[in-house]
């Protein structure tokens, strides 16, 4: 019997013999009141975070968070009767959330506004009163203290979607995808310089200089980069380490039941296996994961289940298993790289430790797990329980260039 299997069996037995309690948050404990609210900044006491778009843990002491600006900090309203809708209808009730941050935050849904921070036609409210476009890139330390704010870049963001550092880049450039601007930004590690922009701002397309609402990035060990493109696009684009366009693949599918290999709708998540160089693509519109070689040759696929399944992103860590965040079921899902389902955890709610709209997640070198949630408008931190079964923890990341 292997040491890993023996440890897993022992841990399972120990948890099974624990008296009382229950398994709410999988193998984790929630770190409450992390990070500090943006309202703690001087003069900002009336505002809180907008929709949580992305999170990336460079280290346990430097965690990047993306928000769609800020929302008014309002206490939960008292329950009231909605007599215009019916005699016994009231809201909010029980533990149900009362404000959906992704609807309330700028720029709203659908296509981008005309300028960064401008609302779309479907957004209802007054800018500066019901939402404001500030503090889109915030960095916290291990204790949740806000240690950096890259407010100088708010003006070039319209809907920041994803943030990460290429794990094979010793200079640790920071990459941010903005799906409404249709571009990918490459910043210096300290955020002082915008070093590269891939894509043409506000001009859609499907080539080496145009995207159609791109969503996520993934890198191979030689820094080859793959772009999931995207909400409206139906392809994967491949670039070399300098940002030179190499090739792309993917054709428009017919959702929600497209079965043809290489046809996609809403390409919203991508991950790579550094050993085999396989590319795992979340074909969100058709509820499946498609697997390709690095040049787009179709290899395999598996279904992510029927409604309410709604996979938002993929991640492959150091243990070479694939984790997916399911916004529809509010669960984290674990698979082997052949698509065999292994484990899941998660609970819906806007209370501390619950999930509501997980749109990004990350793991640091100590195994702490972070989520960014568009609906609840927050980023959360989870700490592994003492003696937690390693097989139930989201794998630590690959950091080969930083060791």
Predicted regions and their residues:
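Sec-dependent N-terminal signal peptides
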Residues: 4-13
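Eukaryotic scaffold repeat domains enriched in small/polar residues
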Residues: 17-403
């Amino acid at each position: 019997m292997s040491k890993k299997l023996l440890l897993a069996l022992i841990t399972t037995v120990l948890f099974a013999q624990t008296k009382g309690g229950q398994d709410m948050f999988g193998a984790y404990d929630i770190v409450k009141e992390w990070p500090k609210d943006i309202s703690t900044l001087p003069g900002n006491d009336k505002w809180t975070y907008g929709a949580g778009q992305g999170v990336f843990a460079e280290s346990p002491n430097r965690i990047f968070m993306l928000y769609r600006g800020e929302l008014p900090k309002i206490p939960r309203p008292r329950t009231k009767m909605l007599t215009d809708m019916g005699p016994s209808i009231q809201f909010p009730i029980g533990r149900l959330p009362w404000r959906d941050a992704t609807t309330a935050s700028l720029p709203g849904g659908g296509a981008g506004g005309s300028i960064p921070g401008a609302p779309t036609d479907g957004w209802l409210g007054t800018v500066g009163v019901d939402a404001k476009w500030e503090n889109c890139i915030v960095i916290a330390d291990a204790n949740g203290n806000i240690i950096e704010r890259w407010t100088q870049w708010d003006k070039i963001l319209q809907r920041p979607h994803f943030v990460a550092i290429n794990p094979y880049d010793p200079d640790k450039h920071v990459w941010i995808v903005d799906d409404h601007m249709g571009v990918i930004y490459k910043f210096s590690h300290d955020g002082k310089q915008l070093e590269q922009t891939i894509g043409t701002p506000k001009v859609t397309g499907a080539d080496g200089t145009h995207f159609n609402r791109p969503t996520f990035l993934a890198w191979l060990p030689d820094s080859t980069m793959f772009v999931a493109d995207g909400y409206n696009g139906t392809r994967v684009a491949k670039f070399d380490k300098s940002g030179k366009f190499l090739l792309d693949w993917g054709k428009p599918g017919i959702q929600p039941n497209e079965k043809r290999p290489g046809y996609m709708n809403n390409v919203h998540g991508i991950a790579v296996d550094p050993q085999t160089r396989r590319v795992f693509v979340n074909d969100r519109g058709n509820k499946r994961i498609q697997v390709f070689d690095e040049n787009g040759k179709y290899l395999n696929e598996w279904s992510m289940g029927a409604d309410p399944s709604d996979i938002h992103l993929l991640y492959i860590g150091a243990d070479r298993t694939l984790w997916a965040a399911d916004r529809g079921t509010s669960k984290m899902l674990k698979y082997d790289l052949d698509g065999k389902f292994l484990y899941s955890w998660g609970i819906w709610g806007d209370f501390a430790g619950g999930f509501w709209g997980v749109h990004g997640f990350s793991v640091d070198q100590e195994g702490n797990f972070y989520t960014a949630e568009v609906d609840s408008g927050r980023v959360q931190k989870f700490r592994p329980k003492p003696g937690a079964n390693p097989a139930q923890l989201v794998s630590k990341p690959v950091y080969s260039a930083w060791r």
